[in-house]
A protein has these predicted regions:
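C-terminal beta-sandwich/jelly-roll accessory domains of carbohydrate-active enzymes
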Residues: 75-151
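Active-site-proximal substrate-binding groove within the catalytic cores of carbohydrate-active enzymes
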Residues: 1-106
């Protein structure tokens, strides 16, 4: 569901046949989509560089926030965690980076940095752009959403 936040959030599904858990998941997705839509559809689209070809990252950077969708499309070639640098942020501001798990948590392996398991961290824009965030070692075909807001 994380990658569908980047486009038109429609459902090719007979939602009248959904059970309570599925209906609740759709409601959480719709709420998150509505919240993030102004940034995703109105921000600049950037593609942070990642070394391992299994990673994909798409950042939407607006005037007041950023949304980053991070995914793996295959098994990681390198077991060592990679850093995600977030371009386009004001280097002089502090930002709160939150992992948005409303639509499900990504499955990951043996490396999960504290900021990821805790769900949020506050850092300067300069550090996010130059040093970046250590990524968890996601299993194949997993994704997560980061919401970046100034504090």
């Amino acid at each position: 569901m994380a990658t569908s936040l980047m486009g038109s959030a429609g459902f090719e599904w007979d939602i009248l046949s959904c059970d309570e858990a599925e209906t609740a998941a759709i409601a959480r997705f719709a709420a998150l989509y509505k919240e993030l839509r102004p940034v995703v559809h109105g921000g600049r689209v950037l593609h942070p560089e990642l070394r391992d070809p299994a990673w994909r990252a798409t950042a939407f950077v607006g005037a007041t926030a950023a949304v980053v969708v991070v995914a793996t499309v295959a098994s990681l070639e390198d077991a060592r965690a990679e850093r995600l640098r977030l371009p386009g942020l004001d280097p002089d501001r502090r930002y709160r980076v939150r992992v948005r798990r409303e639509i499900g948590a990504a499955e990951y392996g043996w490396i999960a940095p504290e900021w990821f398991t805790a769900g949020e961290i506050e850092l300067p824009g300069s550090l996010l752009a130059e040093v970046g965030l250590q990524l968890p070692t996601l299993w194949p075909l997993q994704a997560f959403v980061l919401h970046v807001e100034p504090v």
